[in-house]
Amino acid sequence: MKPLLFALCAVFAFGGLSAQQTAWQPSPGHTQVPIWPGAVPDAQPVTGPEVARTTVREWLVAGRPAVGVSNVSRPTMTRYSPDGKNTGAAVVVFPGGGYLDLAIDLEGTEVCDWLTAKGITCVLLKYRVPGEPGYPKPASYPKSGPYPESPMALEDAQRTMGLVRFHAAEWHIDPHKIGVLGFSSGGHLVAAMSTHFAKRLYPAVDAADKESCRPDFAVAIYPGHLSLSAAQWDAKQGAKKVVIHYLATADKDLGLNPDIPVTHQTPPTFLLQAEDDNVDNVNDSLAYYIALKSAGVPVEMHLFARGGHAFGLRRTKFPITGWPQLVETWLGTIAMISK
């Protein structure tokens, strides 16, 4: 994540906002379910109530506003069932927002609309981002960020994957066809889930935590925090300092963040990014791709010359925004859905 993050991921800076709304609620017919039945692990101080904000016309995406959610201290999941035919596959979706807020519609509910139309169950995770977007932060501010700077988002993701597997039969899901899809910081969370599944970061709560939290496949769209240079930038903002001196002779642009320990057990992965992305550098995808290939992990990557950052599924003049068809084809290639 480059210094432009001080504008908070371009669109989701919310430097110009419309009227502040109440806490986010899903569309009628869908219910948010708290993922933690009791105390939330590694809870941070709450700076205020959860709020949803809508961007004003200076921050439109494909001519439409977007909604960002911040001050999330009680994470939830919302399940969206397939329309018509059920493929048996499921995807847990991680919206982006720099680990400071969540692009809940652009990179959340709109993704679920697409997935369910393709016969895929979607589970939207509203993971913890306990505070308001924007920099700089005082030392006393709730700590959030990529793992291991903060364990909260990864804990929420691990817990949700276990819950989806635990309820697979009830929800008509194949427990061996459950993947993850994320954007920007949510793309980093995809990589973290793909490489930190052997052990939960929190004490087991119930039977759901006995289920594997390894995704069966992973989709990272314009991911951040993955290259060594991105990790070094994160470290200067207060993340794990070890990356500053990690492999001083390594290529900092194409070397992988050491907190993403890729192995041959990392699930098959799809990567997509634009070369003119000025929030998360294309080297984040390249570094992860190289590490995956080196470990023998099936991986497909699509790089486009133009397209920028934070476009979600909204079609623009740039070909990169046709990526959902590429993902659908790839899911057939790896036998998660029928071709």
Question: Model regions: which residues?
Answer:
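Acidic catalytic loop of the alpha/beta-hydrolase fold
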Residues: 226-227, 276-280
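N-terminal cap/lid segment of alpha/beta-hydrolase-fold proteins
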Residues: 21-86
